[in-house]
Amino acid sequence: MAEIQFVKVTKAFGSNKVIEDLDLTIQDGKFTVLVGASGCGKTTLLRMIAGIGPATSGHVLMDGKDITDLDPAKRDIAMVFQNYAIYPTMTVKENIEFGLKNRKVPKEEREKLIKEYAAVVGLTDYLDRKPGTLSGGQRQRIALARAMVKKPKVFLMDEPLSNLDAKLRVAMRTELIEMHNRLKTTFIYVTHDQTEAMAMADQIVLMDKGKIMQEASPEVIYHDPNNAFTAQFIGTPPMNILPMGEDKLGFRPERVQLGTQRLEGAPFARKGHILTREMLGSETTYKIQMGDEAIMVKSPDDTFQYDQDVVLSVRADDLYFFDKDGQRIRRGDVSNYDQYIQRAGGNNNA
């Protein structure tokens, strides 16, 4: 296991600085997910750890040791990519064994490691098969097993599930969580998919344009976002954010109470009209026109219908406020927080 630190790291391509003066600590033994849209800098950070995309300035540390300029082969890491990068002419066993042979690991130890990690990834019965005869998920497991037999201090994973179909992605997600729980190794996982990040991470690092927007556990990043960007990136559907003078008002779709009358005591209450209805089994998602704004509501109540008039209510504890720059306004930040709640109900019509 290992702790990774970025200290005042900058990465530039020519005159374009994609990451500037970044500080980040990735905790030892945690499953950390770097998440953000394409081009936000998450893979650039991963490549710096791997040593295949060195920092322009600043330092990358592993357990306090400066590895900024260390040869990638000496970093005690293993990397799994979006593409499987396995040898189609070799059997599963030969693929897993390949790196061990190159490192001149004795045969007896190789056999032991292959047996151990083939069992971890569920490939024991497929060791003599060629990759072409296996499913996409099984091929990705070969790549995982080949990384695991190295017993690295750090696993780096760059969107390893993005080539799999939706059902298989969910299954592999669970398997990766179980693998991390068994191995207790530092996992650093890159994805653009916030659902993957929320489902898998001990710690999420949300990035945008080379900057860290928030670093926190899934629970904190969802319930206590620092800014409007985080609030709307994390969550499906994303948080509804409405103008409120110079400031902004937000609330999660699932915290809206739908009905035919205003919820007693709710400071926010507006009339709306259902534009669309998506029944998803345990919950139903509604798109609702509310004055000049269209918002999303997620409810366990599937009795509301398309084209129906409804009343939307939100309790005070479920309201979020942001300033004109999108930064969160919390009760402890201002002395007049209750005035924000009153302002939230300024346009009530229900």
PLM region spans:
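Conserved structural motif at the start of ABC-family nucleotide-binding domains
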Residues: 4, 19-21
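ABC ATPase nucleotide-binding domain
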Residues: 5, 25, 61, 311-313
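The feature captures the beta-strand-to-loop junction immediately N-terminal to the Walker
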Residues: 35-37
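ABC ATPase nucleotide-binding domain helices that frame the ATP-binding cleft
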Residues: 43-46, 142
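Helix-to-loop junction immediately C-terminal to a conserved catalytic motif
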Residues: 50
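Conserved ABC transporter NBD signature motif
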Residues: 58-66
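ABC ATPase nucleotide-binding domains
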Residues: 72-226
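Non-catalytic connector elements of ABC transporters
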Residues: 237, 248-350
